[in-house]
Amino acid sequence: MTPAQQRQFDAITADLNRLVRYDDESVVHEHWIRQRYDGGYAATYRPARTAAVITAWHEAGHVVAALATGARFTSASIRHSATSAGRVHAITTGGRDAFVIHAAGQIAERLRDWTTLDDDAELAAWLSTWRDDGGDARHFRATLGPGYGEVSAWRHAERILTPRRLQIRHLARALLVYPRYLPYGVTKALYQAVSYQAGNPASESSTTSAPAS
């Protein structure tokens, strides 16, 4: 990391430690709430908060999948625009597991509230309806390797991402508390910071609402 990125990492880590007992919606930076409300993407602040959280988990899923498969990217952000609610910028190929990166946003959203589909028939039915999603669905299907159907590829992606739920959550919360984009070096450091702390109960059980600001 550059010195500037180290300062970003330290500031984000300090904020996450300070807010460790608060739930995800309570840690959303006002910038992301106002950006969604002022831009007309949410009718009130409450749905703006919720939308920011869902987007943060989605983009954090892409980040973790990229890091897990050895792909590179330039930065990640939950800035809402006319074409997307957030973005991981300039992702390079993830090799033969590139499809994992494209599935990761949806998988992370389901890991957030533990709504993954265990039944293969139910998953196949859902996949048949999955379209667009900022290009994720199209890229997922385009990068399936030999020997993979959609369901088997999805299960493979889940096997990679489910053990990394803590990392996804940590990066999602980092995206929520920091009001600007996160460069690759900072996201990688945040990912590595929890890679050896999977047994930390405080990281997995934040349910308190923060005081109104």
Report residues per predicted region:
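Soluble catalytic regions of large protease machineries
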Residues: 2-213
